[in-house]
Amino acid sequence: MTLGTLGSRLTGLVRTWAMAFALGNSLLTSAYQVANNLPNVMYELVAGGFLSAAFLPVLLLEREKHGQEGGNRYTSNILNLTLIVLGLLSLVCCIFAPQVVSTQTFTVGNDAEVAEATTEFFRIFAFQIVFYGLGGVITGVLNAGRSFFLTSIAPALNNVVVIASFIAYIPLSHIDSELALNVLAVGTTAGVAVQFVIQIPALVKSGYHWEPFISLSDPAIKETLKIALPSIIYIVANLVAFTFRNAFSLSATPSGPSILGYAWMWYQLPYGVVAVSLSSTMFTEMSDSVAKGDRAGLLRNINQGLRGTLYLIIPLTGMLFVLSEPLMGLFHAGAFGSSDVTQVASVLSIWVLSLPIYSAAMYLYKAFAAIRKLMAFSLINIACVGVQVGLYAALSQPDVLGIYGVPVGDFVYYLVRGIASLVLLRHYVGAADMRGLVAMGVKTVLATLFGGVIVWALLAVVPLTSTAGIGAALLQIVIGGIVGLVTMFGATKVLRVEEFRVIGSLAAKLKGRARR
């Protein structure tokens, strides 16, 4: 699973590089990004909450009650309903593409060039919706059988197909621009199809056999709806925020969604690699404590998870901040120019300041899921999203902060949501060790500032290379990254941060493997 996830991350980086080379940081890139995100939005809005939050636990329950055949019957019911509903939704979205796209571009109007380009892409991208539904069911069945490799490596195959599409687009764009755009749109949709269709043989091998069965009155369907409702409320609120983010970034600049897309890739990387793994592990521990009625153990796990998340993410945030320009310099090729590097890097350097708060807020979401109080959390999130959307509207105007209004709005949103979550969590399970958490956070921030200054001085005072470009950026990232991380985590040891033992334990394991 780890190898599969790593492969998906690496090919995702190459995919973004290919997009930067082919499209640059332009109006067309914004149109592509918005249109390519819309199928995900529509899928999550209609079926994502059911399939991601409720399908797996109900499937396991049906297998426990009625055996493999009962599980197959429930799966067929969900699969058939999903394909019918999402198939119709794909068709409707294709026909009414301008109206759907207007939900993301209402700040610039339907006649704007970016809206028209987004519409043309989305007419083809709309058919991704049904494949996302198919994938949601397949992934649930395979995960129920603890088969994780194919589901983790499949996104890499998607990325490979899309990379090939970008490569094909480059020469075609000089011959027939309309054909080039169609190839890119079809290739991107084909990538999503490949990602999930490639898993069908594993689905069959797992023991599943399809049945032509549909029943809305099935008790298992009602249980699915009951479990999924809090997640659906949470998802809908976040999708509203995502819609306004797109719309107000477009009002700031036509390349707004493009800028945010490139910056978001680096923003998400440390969270996806480090924080998600930790929160997934701690979710199991928290759930186990809840099942045993061990409130002290639950509080201990919540506290340990928060401390561990912040300890690992704060230094990585510092590295993203100080290396923001070299990181974006990796895309300095083709249509992605030096001005694009500077612009996206400046947005990333501001946005990344909210990364520790974002990671902590997402961890607290897991805590609420473990104690089965997601409904209360979701209702609080609605109020916080209202604040977030209001800040987007107020700050993202060209004469205020422009595109920088989005990261500032997100910082406030995650801060408010995090504080509200801690207050609500205290109501349900008691107070966490806030004094120890704050002390650890302050020490880690000081260590990060110390290491960040050293890396900044290294890059500014002692030039690592006299030439610009991808090679120079890579050299700065490697040398600056090694020096920075060693200095930052080393400083936490000097400051006696307890969580340093996590790094020490990891280093010992790696040393042991190297000896073997």
Q: Positions of the model-derived regions?
A:
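Membrane-embedded alpha-helical bundles of multi-pass transporters/translocases
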Residues: 1-516
